[in-house]
Amino acid sequence: MVIIWILLLSFISCGPQVSWAKRLEREPKYPCSRGGKLCDPRQRRDAGGRGGVYEHLGGAPRNRKLYCATKYHLQIHLNGKINGTLEKNSVFSILEITAVDVGIVAIKGLFSGRYLAMNQRGRLYASETYNPECEFVERIHELGYNTYASRLYRTVPSGAGTKRKASAERLWYVSINGKGRPRRGFKTRRTQKSSLFLPRVLDNKDHDAVRLFHTNAVYRESILKPSKPSGRQRRGQ
């Protein structure tokens, strides 16, 4: 009789453990972000230590137009030129803004295929390839506009001969002046109109242009075809 009671108690104590183990085995697995391996959903949610809040980082780019407070849209041209345009539906003002890190974005011209970049002299240019000069710190201004500052370059005051604190660094901002021309980064401030940009969603005409660019080879070639030089020459040439 004692042996029967011992066997019964051992069966009761082991039963829930076996059941719980089977439930863990049956729990669905999901693909991890890398390698295509299956992993626990909690591990997938905590990957990178960010949780689900920043799952959009590194994802699909946002198609936007950057409208400067000086009333110009930022353009990235095929020839590497950066400027502003008053034209509402210029195809070279349609941009892809992609988050590459927390608060860091890369800005690419959808039609030119070039990246917005700032060199060590504070000049804006359109780079054919992605490099560290193409990374910008994106911040939301208190007026509702965004600012874009070079991640790589900034003005660091020297410790000697200055009243500024050593930590008072000055960022170099992307800017378009009142004539549609880019200003050098170290000459701008985040409160100036030339450095304030409003990301605008594309309208119907912009969406039609994007669709044609991806589906119509003739239209795409007409956009990518270099413009012919003007017949008139400048004076002194």
Curated annotation (Swiss-Prot):
<dbReference type="Pfam" id="PF00167">
    <property type="entry name" value="FGF"/>
</dbReference>
<feature type="signal peptide">
    <location>
        <begin position="1"/>
        <end position="21"/>
    </location>
</feature>
<dbReference type="GO" id="GO:0051781">
    <property type="term" value="P:positive regulation of cell division"/>
</dbReference>
<dbReference type="GO" id="GO:0005737">
    <property type="term" value="C:cytoplasm"/>
</dbReference>
<dbReference type="GO" id="GO:0022008">
    <property type="term" value="P:neurogenesis"/>
</dbReference>
<keyword id="KW-0732">Signal</keyword>
<dbReference type="GO" id="GO:0005615">
    <property type="term" value="C:extracellular space"/>
</dbReference>
<keyword id="KW-0339">Growth factor</keyword>
<dbReference type="InterPro" id="IPR002209">
    <property type="entry name" value="Fibroblast_GF_fam"/>
</dbReference>
<protein>
    <recommendedName>
        <fullName>Fibroblast growth factor 3</fullName>
    </recommendedName>
</protein>
<keyword id="KW-0221">Differentiation</keyword>
<comment type="function">
    <text>Plays an important role in the regulation of embryonic development, cell proliferation, and cell differentiation.</text>
</comment>
<dbReference type="GO" id="GO:0008284">
    <property type="term" value="P:positive regulation of cell population proliferation"/>
</dbReference>
<dbReference type="InterPro" id="IPR008996">
    <property type="entry name" value="IL1/FGF"/>
</dbReference>
<keyword id="KW-0497">Mitogen</keyword>
<comment type="similarity">
    <text>Belongs to the heparin-binding growth factors family.</text>
</comment>
<dbReference type="GO" id="GO:0008083">
    <property type="term" value="F:growth factor activity"/>
</dbReference>
<keyword id="KW-0325">Glycoprotein</keyword>
<dbReference type="GO" id="GO:0043410">
    <property type="term" value="P:positive regulation of MAPK cascade"/>
</dbReference>
<dbReference type="GO" id="GO:0030334">
    <property type="term" value="P:regulation of cell migration"/>
</dbReference>
<keyword id="KW-0217">Developmental protein</keyword>
<dbReference type="GO" id="GO:0008543">
    <property type="term" value="P:fibroblast growth factor receptor signaling pathway"/>
</dbReference>
<feature type="glycosylation site" description="N-linked (GlcNAc...) asparagine">
    <location>
        <position position="83"/>
    </location>
</feature>
<dbReference type="GO" id="GO:0005104">
    <property type="term" value="F:fibroblast growth factor receptor binding"/>
</dbReference>
